[in-house]
Amino acid sequence: MMNVPIENGTFPHVIMGEFDANAGISQKKQPTKDPLLKGAAGHGCGHNLFGTASLGAAVAIKNLIASGKLKGTVKFYGTPAEEKFFGKLWMARAGLFDDLDACVDWHPAD
């Protein structure tokens, strides 16, 4: 998990950067859908987009805060195990969501 706060106000907002490392899928190590074995089970529902697009959004907000065009606090949380549903549970138990005003997460389509 990564917590990189950019502060210029109160009430933190978090952008979640989902990532997974699922074993046993038929997908070459690249950002586009390309199976190891044609027709084999794989996973390509946009997981290659989670981390990079979310980090890009956090950087854009950081730049607005730094320029004085926006007040607030933004944090970026690298979020593990989205596919298995327990990553956010670990984060909640660690108290990472306790002081937030809002938390943004999303899921692209395949």
Residue ranges and their predicted role:
Residues 1-43, 48, 52-72:
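Acidic/His- and Gly-rich active-site-bordering loop/insert found
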